[in-house]
Amino acid sequence: MNYFFITGTSSGIGQALANVLLTDKNNIVTGISRSVTINSENYRHIKLDLNDIESVSKFDFGELKEPEIICLVNNSAHFSESKHYGKADTRDIIKNYNVNNISPGIIINNFLSAYQSYNCKRIIINISSGAATTAIESWSNYCSSKAALLMLSKVIALEQSLNYPSDPVKIYSVSPGVVDTPAQERIRNTSPENFSMVGKFIEFHEKKQLSDPVIVAEKIAKIIFNTDNFINTEIHVNDIQI
């Protein structure tokens, strides 16, 4: 069997990826989020708020019997309210780094602790963003947290190559592009006073330039099942053909 742990399965890319994987009865998907939106015989759900660090710290991966693939997908993210620094809400800043950095770090650490010694394919995919490498006004929290997650991916990849050169856990930072998700709707509803680029994102939507989450999910699945073809830690879905 193949086992998948995906954060943020209630909507967007996480939900789409879970549904894509669940088309194969050999795949068991565990969703990690605050709400359940998927009903499938092979779907399990763990209700967990990634802003609650104490609860996340207690989360533990269980023992798996004869797995062929074990994969963690850190998809969940908090997109802070678009405001310039000096006007940002302190609680929103804390939530951003809790959800986008601290919780993924804890979950990755627990995943490696649980499954490093397993004799099967083990994969970690961190969903990144163009914001990880581009400064965007009013997105200070999101840009910096995605940049931190990208660097975490690179460091773990380095550690795996040094400590387990013949059998590393594969880790990828995958940038999905501009995807039609609830986060995009929130961006389009931002006041131009707080985000001068809002018109560009409205145009993306009007011109139907947003990627379908299902297509993005299918490309992520291609990475998972073809890791030998993906050498670099950083991947953009636009470079993947399906």
Feature-to-residue mapping (PLM):
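N-terminal Rossmann NAD(P)H-binding glycine-rich loop of SDR-like oxidoreductase domains
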Residues: S10-N19
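Rossmann-fold cofactor-recognition segment
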Residues: S40-E54
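Conserved mid-core segment of classical short-chain dehydrogenase/reductases
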Residues: H78-I94, S113, S138
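Active-site helix of classical SDR
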Residues: I108, S145, S153
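Residue(s) in the substrate-gating loop at a strand-loop-helix junction
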Residues: S129
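Active-site loop-to-helix junction immediately N-terminal to the catalytic Tyr of the SDR YXXXK motif
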Residues: A135-C143, V155
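C-terminal helical subdomain
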Residues: S173, T181, S191-I242
